[in-house]
Amino acid sequence: MAKDKIVLAYSGGLDTSIILKWLQTERNYDVVCFTADLGQGDEVEEARVKALNTGAVAAYALDLREEFVRDYVFPMFRSSALYEGYYLLGTSIARPLIAKKMVEIAQKEGAVAVSHGATGKGNDQVRFEMTAYALQPDIVTVAPWRDWEFQGRADLEAFAHEHGIPVPTTKKDPWSTDANMLHISYEGGILEDPWAEPPAHMFKLTVAPEEAPDEAEYVEIEFLNGDAVAINGETLSPAALLDRANEIGGRHGVGRVDLVENRFVGMKSRGVYETPGGTLLYHARRAVESLTLDREVLHQRDALGPKYAELVYNGFWFAPEREALQVYMDHVAKAVTGTARLKLYKGNCIVAGRKAERSLYDKDLVSFEAGGDYNQHDAGAFIKLNALRMRVQARVEAKAGQKDKAGD
């Protein structure tokens, strides 16, 4: 009798290799492995080969770099989303794409279930499984970290030795990482102490600001209908543009963030992030928006941005409310066409200029010189009308105070 198939999100590391074998031996599945190339390096094809050598009945390695930036990162950027004011959501935005491809492979392979290596304490389990259920409501999800009996690293390594899975002999970094084209995240281990400064050798995308060049670099980023399309006059594809921005920002130490964030599952965690290219694009886009977006539209968009960020962070990318918000964000972004000039210096990303053909900025209006459509005499009536409610309240309070004194 044929076994049921399950699709595993496979990284090639020790943990997902153990999961692969555990799904075979303990759950009696034929395992189909899937590795997504989101720009994390050369190990994608190596992971595919390792999956087959470890016992997978099939293994996929898909280059998703352009799709990731075009259909996930850039739409998210249109909302100017920052989770809790700092985090550019590099891990969060990658999970729905990975889970979507898992479901598509499951449908192609006739698999009944999907599996992942996320722990039972983190956000990724939610992101993977929420996406899977949204796209295939009857899919079975298997989360080994929530199900198996292993009590610690020693048990995992014993299982690996029993089943011929190589266990690295080199000392592991005392933190975990997740990398893609948008960022690298670091958490756990020595970083669990929120007072401990991350070691200098941990960072991979950015130089230390104090070791960055002593001379500032200027970079121009051009936007068309809300998306970055060119750097320093060179038109690039979404993925190539983000790569270029990462390279430029990284050599100046731009884009490091260290924060304690609130996980969806209820606990606080400390995360350290490198997002050099995303940081450049964020500040450049805000600069162009300052010229091209109406005040009330900009303020309304910014009021909705934190909610959008929360939905992405919590795993609701395919939820109807996120999709509805996206329609609004895309409509607003149509006006964002122009160029920003940034000055990069020792970890700082400073807006040094912005221009747009359809700019709402009118130099004549803001000039201190006489003339133009703005009559300064009108300001008095404007102020008085806007102060009306406060004047009424002050009179009421003054009258009430007089009564209180009379009562004394």
Curated annotation (Swiss-Prot):
A GO BP entry: argininosuccinate metabolic process
Enzyme class: ligase
GO cellular component, one term: cytoplasm
Main location: cytoplasm
Binding-site residues, L-citrulline: 87, 92, 123, 127, 176, 185, 261, 273
Pathway, per record: Amino-acid biosynthesis; L-arginine biosynthesis; L-arginine from L-ornithine and carbamoyl phosphate: step 2/3
SUPFAM superfamilies cross-referenced by the UniProt entry: Adenine nucleotide alpha hydrolases-like (SSF52402), Argininosuccinate synthetase, C-terminal domain (SSF69864)
This enzyme's EC code(s): 6.3.4.5
UniProt KW Protein biosynthesis keyword: no
Gene Ontology MF, one: ATP binding
Name of the protein this chain belongs to: Argininosuccinate synthase
Lineage start: Bacteria, Thermotogati, Deinococcota, Deinococci, Deinococcales
